[in-house]
């Protein structure tokens, strides 16, 4: 596997700043793209090549709002997801397109998003496990080869969900940072298997994660999880909650943004020791701007 194009300088910068600052990450791509005109049935990854100017515009809005870390529009851009969504271009093309779209916004740092693959497996020597690991390896290499500063395996609901993905990402990483982010409930347990956040952090770090965090959970869940993660983790902690479930309308899902609540919360997360803060589904650059002001970025 050729790693000569990996962005080693960017990886060093990401690692250094995660260990010394509280960075502000951008908000979501998927829910913002859904709000575009007549976009309800368009898979987010489709935009990377078909409407790159739209993806770049959203990234630029986040940068203008104060985001220091951008996250590629590749949450569902594995070969499995592209096939499911009937997107013809290759994993390499779609993921490189997403990286190029984000780089147009001139971010300080750029993470490559990897979402759940959705294949069930039952043993590490099974065909399914090897398939997931290979799919993750392929996407990780595509993102790293396109120039991201690190990988972000996000919205992880169980250790079973994480295990082959983290293995595949590390197969491709060759020393590049791999961040892992879980989804937890208000009790601090993973949504998929009920494991507590401390045990999830221990597993991720033991198997090579360079950072641990939570995303796409409620503000209350994030507020409870952050100090527990900081107390148990040996790597930088990240936090990016959502605003809750959308209201379904005839024009598609509608979220009710609450930038003031996120602005208040991010101060507490920084005080607790979080290395990167941000927001997830249902927010926009409006929330990012409120957080940037609160953090004096």
PLM segments and residue spans:
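Domain-level signal for soluble alpha/beta catalytic cores
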Residues: 1-297
């Amino acid at each position: 596997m050729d790693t000569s194009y990996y962005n080693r300088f960017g990886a060093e910068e990401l690692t250094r700043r995660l260990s010394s600052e509280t960075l502000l990450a951008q908000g979501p791509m998927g829910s913002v793209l859904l709000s575009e005109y007549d976009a309800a049935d368009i898979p987010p990854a489709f935009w990377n090549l078909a409407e790159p100017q739209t993806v770049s515009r959203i990234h630029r809005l986040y940068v203008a709002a104060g985001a220091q870390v951008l996250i590629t529009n590749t949450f569902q851009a594995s070969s499995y997801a592209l096939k499911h969504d009937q997107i013809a271009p290759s994993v390499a093309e779609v993921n490189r397109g997403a990286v190029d779209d984000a780089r147009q916004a001139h971010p300080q740092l750029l993470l490559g998003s990897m979402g759940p693959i959705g294949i069930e497996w039952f043993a590490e020597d099974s065909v399914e496990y090897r398939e997931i690991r290979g799919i993750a390896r392929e996407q990780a290499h595509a993102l790293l080869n396109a120039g991201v500063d690190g990988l972000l395996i996000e919205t992880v609901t169980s250790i079973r969900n994480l295990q082959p993905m983290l293995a595949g990402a590390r197969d491709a990483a060759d020393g590049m940072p791999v961040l892992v982010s879980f989804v937890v409930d208000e009790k601090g347990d993973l949504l998929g298997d009920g494991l507590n956040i401390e045990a999830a952090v221990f597993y991720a770090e033991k198997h090579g994660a360079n950072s641990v965090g939570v995303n796409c959970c409620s503000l209350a869940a994030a507020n409870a999880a952050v100090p527990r993660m900081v107390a148990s983790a040996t790597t930088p902690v990240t936090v990016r909650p959502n605003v809750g479930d959308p209201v379904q309308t005839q024009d598609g899902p509608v979220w009710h943004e609450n930038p003031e609540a996120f602005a208040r919360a991010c101060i507490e997360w920084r005080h607790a020791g979080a290395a990167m803060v941000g927001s997830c589904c249902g927010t926009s650059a409006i929330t990012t701007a409120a957080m940037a002001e609160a953090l004096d970025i």
